């Protein structure tokens, strides 16, 4: 069996209904589990960015990205290892307010983990932590002894360490070489 590495796939596309389903089918056909997913607008007007993490090997990732790029609404797709990108996720923790008021060590945990309090009411307090998955998980484990009422973690958001977004170069080359539907972007 080949070595499995966590890869981050970024897909740049036009904002079209059903594209997420088409992309997830490609992952399913290759028997790849999506570990995290986030979709938003990108720095380029009219272009959306999908950020997807999955465990796989390099050869499978190359094939996956080529297959994703065959979709008509996909502009470009790339894959990266963790050392090629800067990434974060956001986690929210809901803990009982009375535990926070009765035990000062929760405040110390919040400071230690560089987390922040988003909301406090009589019943619960919501704490936010951004960081890598191991950091958000570590805070969850430490808060667990205080009866975490709810815990949720976002999908990964990532940018490359490159000085320019790779899709920008691609779009400028297309714009120069031939007029396409992208000219309206």
Regions found by a protein language model. Give the residues of each.
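Short glycine-/aliphatic-rich beta-strand segments at the starts of folded cytosolic domains
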Residues: 5-13, 49-50, 85-97
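Helix N-cap motif at beta-to-alpha junctions
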Residues: 16, 54-60, 98-100, 131-136
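Helix-adjacent hinge/juxtasegments
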Residues: 57-97
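Single conserved hydrophobic/aromatic residue that forms the stacking wall/gate
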Residues: 174-185
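Conserved short beta-strand edge segments in small beta-sheet-based binding/regulatory domains
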Residues: 72-84, 115-121, 147-161
């Amino acid at each position: 069996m080949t070595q499995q590495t966590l890869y981050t796939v970024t897909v740049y596309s036009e904002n079209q209904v059903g594209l997420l389903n088409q992309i997830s089918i490609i992952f399913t056909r290759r028997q790849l589990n999506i570990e995290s997913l986030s979709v938003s607008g990108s720095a380029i007007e009219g272009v959306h960015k999908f950020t997807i993490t999955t465990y796989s090997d390099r050869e499978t990732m190359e094939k996956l990205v080529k297959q994703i790029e065959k979709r008509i609404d996909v502009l470009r797709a790339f894959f990266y290892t963790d050392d090629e990108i800067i990434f974060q996720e956001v986690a929210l923790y809901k803990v009982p307010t009375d535990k926070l008021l009765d035990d000062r060590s929760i405040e110390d945990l919040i400071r230690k983990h560089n987390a922040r309090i988003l909301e406090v009411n009589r019943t619960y307090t919501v704490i936010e932590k951004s960081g890598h998955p191991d950091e958000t998980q570590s805070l969850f484990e430490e808060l667990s002894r205080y009866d975490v009422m709810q815990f949720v973690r976002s999908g990964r958001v990532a940018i490359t360490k490159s000085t320019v977004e790779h899709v920008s170069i691609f779009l400028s080359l297309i714009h120069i070489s031939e007029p396409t539907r992208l000219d309206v972007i």
